[in-house]
């Protein structure tokens, strides 16, 4: 079903009694891709991920992960994936190095412990006990435990929850390192800036269904992808003097103009010529597009 894809899902359904938690989800994740699954609490994200990981049976649909039905995946299949849960426990008395050595013993062809320590950025803490690490550093150890088996695919569930901004950005570098290695990453997160910064593609789920899928910068209906141009009218000009061919929607509040345009480059060119003819500059000029967070809030109906 999936061919060269790492994950293929068709018509996935999961019911709990009369409650349908997942309602016909379709997904495809390419090998080597960083893919983010987004959605509010109760949208079906966790159930979907647990089915992909082989921890939960499905009610209906087809699922393949690395070419195997996860419901039938055995030890050999599990050795090809790594999983980082939202919260995990490690033995506080062991060092980082000893922890990874212990986990390496479970796999037939593990990565070198020193390579994994370097990958997760813990070289200076390799011989420190887990109990003496910060929360962000312990999270890196958990990622190292998921990577020590040299997996083709890694699931990261809310990997930076509780991190301070600096620790989050440092952890993003770890994800970048996985991409460089060609490892497929399936990520869930409530941080839209994290998904926008890391993911090649995202899927947004609501009420057990995918409501949007694609690169973070290309989601949402056409109107929501319009650029927003704002500026202050030059002295001596009026909004009624603006070029007629700008297109889009124009709103005027005093001397401030807000223009939504599907062709911002052309609109800016026309505005620049118009401003020059009126002997002024477009003061306080800004051009922006909706962020992934804007699109997410619109699609999920979040307040």
Q: What are the residue ranges of the model-derived segments?
A:
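ABC transporter nucleotide-binding domains
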Residues: 4-9, 14-206, 211-212
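Non-catalytic surface loops within mature trypsin-like serine protease
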Residues: 31, 124, 233-235, 263, ...
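Short, solvent-exposed polar/charged micro-motifs at secondary-structure junctions
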Residues: 125, 240-241, 260-262, 294-298
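C-terminal coupling/interaction segments
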Residues: 2, 264-303
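A generic structural signal for secondary-structure junctions
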Residues: 82, 104, 108, 221-225, ...
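Solvent-exposed beta-strand sheet faces enriched in polar/charged residues
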Residues: 10, 232, 251, 286-288
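ABC transporter nucleotide-binding domain
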Residues: 171-262
